[in-house]
């Protein structure tokens, strides 16, 4: 038996669909930002501490801690699947932003893999370096953090504009400013420590704070 809707019921149905789409647009996003935000924060802070505590070149081996980022992949996949199961309406923005973050993830994985491989290849070629210049073996890592922050800035800014969520836009701008700060501080003798500390702070403002605000918005508290 066919059910005919009057004009009022049709408008109410359309309104519910729009609200559903808007709500589902944010559903689960906060957890994803928190996952990667806390993971990057833990790794960057750990590297900063190890660089400060360990003597000489031994501290630079802490950069291999970035391989721990792989821990977040299965959790990320699980969260995405849960979001897709709960999502009633998949908008065009969802599809575009999905592609943006896939491209971002591939870029980060490529960057981390490239740094690790380059380090393994470059290390043997610097068998003898002058005392105090051991950092020359780890030159590729001086570009790693600025590149990461620039990618963060792009992804956060685009996401913030697409979802009309200002904290993400602000986080993206902060990451871009941090990138400039790091690029002009290459001459500093403690540049690697500075990079990890700047990355730690940037992730707090770019991922962790927006992530918690997104969760509040999902629960209707914002």
For each predicted feature, which ranges?
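C-terminal ends of transmembrane helices
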Residues: 20, 76-92, 154-161, 208-215
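Selected alpha-helical membrane-embedding segments in polytopic membrane proteins
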Residues: 27-121
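Membrane-proximal helix-loop-helix units in multi-pass membrane proteins
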Residues: 100, 104-171
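Terminal transmembrane helical module of multi-pass membrane proteins
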Residues: 152-222
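N-terminal juxtamembrane cytosolic/stromal segments of multi-pass membrane proteins
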Residues: 1-31
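Helix-coil boundary and interhelical linker segments in multi-pass alpha-helical membrane proteins
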Residues: 49-60, 117-138, 185-192
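Membrane-water interface of alpha-helical transmembrane segments
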Residues: 23-30, 34, 59-62, 94, ...
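Structural signature of hydrophobic alpha-helical transmembrane segments
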Residues: 62-70, 135-148, 197-201
């Amino acid at each position: 038996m066919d059910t005919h809707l009057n004009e009022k019921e049709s408008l109410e149905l359309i309104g519910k669909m729009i609200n559903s789409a808007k709500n589902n647009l944010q559903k689960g996003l906060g957890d994803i930002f928190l996952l990667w935000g806390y993971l990057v924060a833990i790794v960057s802070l750990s590297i900063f501490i190890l660089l400060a505590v360990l003597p000489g070149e031994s501290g630079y081996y802490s950069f291999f801690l970035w391989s721990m980022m792989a821990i977040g992949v299965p959790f990320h996949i699980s969260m995405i699947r849960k979001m897709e199961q709960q999502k009633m309406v998949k908008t065009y923005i969802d599809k575009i932003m999905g592609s943006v973050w896939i491209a971002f993830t591939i870029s980060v994985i490529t960057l981390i893999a490239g740094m690790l491989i380059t380090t393994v290849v470059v290390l043997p070629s610097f068998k003898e370096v002058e005392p105090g210049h051991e950092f020359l073996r780890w030159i590729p890592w001086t570009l790693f953090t600025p590149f990461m922050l620039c990618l963060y800035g792009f992804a956060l800014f685009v996401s913030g504009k697409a979802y009309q969520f200002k904290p993400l836009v602000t986080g993206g701008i902060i990451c871009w400013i941090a990138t400039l700060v790091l690029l002009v501080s290459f001459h500093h003798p403690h540049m690697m420590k500075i990079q990890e500390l700047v990355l730690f702070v940037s992730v707090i403002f770019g991922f962790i704070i927006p992530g918690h605000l997104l969760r509040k918005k999902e629960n209707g508290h914002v």
